[in-house]
Amino acid sequence: MSFYSPSDSKFTRLYHEEVEIAFSAIDCVLNREKSVYGSAELTTGLRLYEALREHKVKTRDELKQKMGAAWFTSNIWNPNVKSARDFAESVRHTLDDGTTVITPAPFTAPGWSQPEYLAFWETLLRTRTKSVWFSLNWQYSNGCTFEFAVAEDAGLPTFDHEGRPLGRSKGIELMGGAIQSLDEDGFNTSTLAENLKRVQTIDVRTREAFPV
C-alpha cells in the first residue's frame, strides 16, 4: 500500500536541469562523501567486437540491422549491464569498508545523446569520485577509455579489475594494443584513438611540468 501514487504529470526540462536532478538524488546517497566508480563496457567493448567478427559486420548499426534490435539487447546490452553491475558488486566486496561503489549501468535518461551521458559521468568523476576501478578488457570500450582519460586528468587513482594500481603508462599500453588489434580487423577505432590521444597529452603535460 502506498500513501501517494505517481502522477502522469508532464514535465519539460533542459538538459542541465535534468543533470541537477540526477545529482541531487546521488547526493542524497553520498551525503558529502565520495564514491568509487566502477567503469565497465556498455554500448561498446570487447563483447560487441566479438559479435561483429562472428557475424561479419563492421559496426553496431550493421549488427542491429542484420540480427535485429531484440537480439542486440539480449546478446550485447543486457549481458553488458549484468557484467557491469556484477563488477561494481565485486569491487564493493573487495573494499569491504562501506564505500559506495557507483556503476553507470542502471542509469537511463530518455532523450540524452551519448555525449550528454559522457558529460554527466565526467562531472560525477570530477566532483564525487575518489578512485576508479576498470573492468577486464576496459580498453576496448569507448566509454571506459574516455573515463580513464577523465580520471587521469582529474588525478584520480585508477585500479584494474583485481584492485591492482593501473596507472597512466599501463593504460596507454593497453589502449594502444586494443586499437592495433581492432585496426587489423578493419574496425573504426577513431573514438578509442581520440581517448588515447587525450591520455597521451596528459602524460606529456605532466612530464613537462615535473621533469625527471
PLM features: what roles do these ranges have?
Residues 1-212:
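Conserved catalytic or regulatory cores that recognize and/or transform ribose-phosphate-containing ligands
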